[in-house]
Amino acid sequence: MTAPVLCIMGPTAVGKSELALSLAERLGGEIVSVDSAQIYRGLDIGTAKPSPAVRARCPHHLIDIRDPAERYSAAEFARDAQAAIAAIRSRGRLPVLVGGTGLYFQALQHGLSPMPAADAQVRAELEAEEAAYGVQALHRRLQAVDPESAARLHPNDSQRIQRALEVHRLTGRPLSQVQREPGQPGLTEMPLKIILEPPERAWLHRRIEARFRAMLAAGLVGEVVALHRRGDLSEELPAVRAVGYRQIWHYLEGACDYRTMIRRGLRATRQYAKRQITWLRGQTDGVRFTADDRLEAQVHSYVTGALGGV
């Protein structure tokens, strides 16, 4: 019998990674990271990346697979995750997927049409950039990443310019190329989806603050300093735009003081968690558990039963 795909889903700081590790160790599994920031080498503290000791206890996949100067699309993730799942199954082990990047889960389960759906977060970022720098600045940026589309669009065609840039950010490829590509299939079977929910919003906010302050104490600013000093990175890149990293990047460039950076970092993380929770509400094929003291025992019991008493 082919091992199913077990997915551990939930907002940031809810306790997904700890649960996934426990399940993988108890059920003979290997972990596949579903995190758009953990793919980057050098982004360790701020992404809560599993330590070398944890990775020695249980194999982890799709971590440290890209340089921060590179982009990585949902389509690439779906391809790489399917390869990792096949390899894990070939060893007779259980694929355990864990993370909070909804677009990655969506791409893996349902596949991708050549044209990605609109993304509210990316669109909001582009609208803010247009408000700050003007539509012609966005058109110049489009010329750099997709000259074919830029030549076709009027420099004042805000809506279509934003869409072309949005497609590039979501896929890592020019709109003109995506329009010529076939779609990508998803999983052929239904994954077993476990969705973790915080007991209350205040509980999650306390955990977010405690974790962010612990990351700062562990050297997160120094980690971003090392990235900043490379000289080949900018806010155009997804690695630098990751929650926490972006706010510290602004602090290093003198845009705010240390206390303001902390406040903005916490706010950005809370907003990210809110978006994740909103997306997870639409995952009607998942089984929901409250992240309390009984979580591990309850999920283990449920998963063991669902897998036929493993």
UniProtKB/Swiss-Prot annotation:
Superkingdom, taxonomy of origin = Bacteria
Pfam families per UniProt: IPPT
EC top class named in words = transferase
Cofactor(s) required for function per UniProt: Mg(2+)
Binding-site residues, ATP: G10, P11, T12, A13, V14, G15, K16, S17
Q: Does the keyword Ligase apply?
A: no
According to its UniProt entry, the protein's GO biological process terms are: tRNA modification
The alphabetical list of record keywords is: ATP-binding, Magnesium, Nucleotide-binding, Transferase, tRNA processing
Q: Which reaction does it catalyse?
A: adenosine(37) in tRNA + dimethylallyl diphosphate = N(6)-dimethylallyladenosine(37) in tRNA + diphosphate
Q: In Gene Ontology terms, what is one molecular function of this protein?
A: ATP binding
Q: Where is this region: Interaction with substrate tRNA?
A: 35-38, 159-163, 274-281
Site description Interaction with substrate tRNA, residues in chain = T101, R123
* Stored InterPro entries: Dimethylallyltransferase (IPR039657), IPT (IPR018022), P-loop_NTPase (IPR027417)
Give the EC number(s) under which this enzyme is classified: 2.5.1.75
* The keyword Phosphoprotein appears for this protein: no
What does the entry list as the binding residues for substrate? T12, A13, V14, G15, K16, S17
Q: How does it assemble?
A: Monomer.
Give the record's family classification: Belongs to the IPP transferase family.
**What is the protein named?**
tRNA dimethylallyltransferase
Gene (UniProt): miaA
